[in-house]
């Protein structure tokens, strides 16, 4: 995630990274999950801690990571849009839109630190695998794999950890990439990683959930989407050997991604060009209207590890 923020979201700008909260900065990046426990995401500050830092450092841009679980009701963080020029968040929750100010924007989740950006994009006809699955095979993903067996020819699986080069090679040699749900929502890195490498993400979702999750900058990604995995596989089979159509799908996906990045850069450039105006009265007025955070979600794999307490800014 750090690579995505530094190399893509802020890729047009020179970044000097500080792992402290005492240095004046233009961009503040922090993780937003339930702060009452250590989690797989690492240290997460409370809303009050983040607000205090923002009031002190006056960053022009805030980038919020995590916050995948709307059940935790972290929407109070969206009010930080009243005291910064631009608040970018990596998940979009329909239930939180009532707290969005004009300065709050949901951006694509992006890619993990376990993958490099591709140097070239292979056209569909030059790809070795019809479809690919890499990752943990959770129970909800077994049905997905069972349905994709109908397209058995030239498939590949990897259930162990792959290095950056191996994962990139697999994506760049795959036509379709079935994308199961993330830990707590439809959104996950795999959809964007496949897109960036020119593979075609395949998602099972209702229209309403897909729109609620992925409507970034008022535009939906042009992935293959179906109500069931059976329907999704049928859609893939219909275009499996239609290489002009596959190339069109690939081109549309890549163009969508480049538009998302370009829009992010435009908004960031504008935000950096302005002085910060902190509307404290409006901030305080709206706090009482927001559902407070709740400790209701347990993340699989949570431990009490000693994790460095840090927020990074640049």
What is each residue range found by the language model?
Residues 1-225, 235, 239, 245-246, ...:
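Nucleotide-sugar donor-binding catalytic core of glycosyltransferases
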Residues 229:
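Short helix-start
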